[in-house]
Amino acid sequence: TFNAQYAWDKIDRINKKRYNKRKRLVNIGYIISGVAATLLLVLGFSKMGVFDKQPEMLVRMTADYGSRSEVVLPDGSVVKLNSGSDITYSYNAKEKIREVNFQGEGFFDVSKNKIPFVIKMNNGLRLKVHGTSFNLQAYTDEKTVEASLVEGCIELDHGNEKLLMNAGDMAVFDKQTNRMRPVSGVLSHSYSWLEDKLYMDHMPLASVCKYLERRYDVTIHLQKDLG
């Protein structure tokens, strides 16, 4: 005998199987299209240089009170930091950034390069070099900034005022007047701290005590009539 219900159920199962197969094919098509679109986006961004841009990393190196340190910058320049100093720079794996923020005292041995090496200080003073060695004293709590050039040529820059220095020159920038001027003195005395020596050429007693506080991480109290 012919079973009509059984026949309809069989036809229904066949139709469902065909529909599901077609649906899977459509879904696979969507997935392939999505992958292709993603690849196109990646290629597009790559051509635009989006993935070529490396994130910059801010690096800060310090020499605490009672210590000293040596820093080798990404461009090969070497900075010896005196006690109570710090230097901050941006690091990028693909770009040689020759710009630093500095406070304290340091002896810079800057590698030669067409790109200028720029030192920024918090009072707006800038020092620009291409390849040279010099001592820079720029403590935040001091009234002056002192630069002593051993080799090469450097330029001090503050607003519209500039001072070009040659080997053997020494200069002072007054933070209160925002003026800079050449000074005379014994050049080697400015970086004698590298050998743990201190020359107190006309140095006030308060400045001597401040130097000793940084160097040995101690606190010195002066009587008012001695300061």
Task: Provide a role label for each language-model segment.
Residues 7, 11, 15-227:
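A residue-level detector for the "anchor" residue at the start of short, highly conserved motifs
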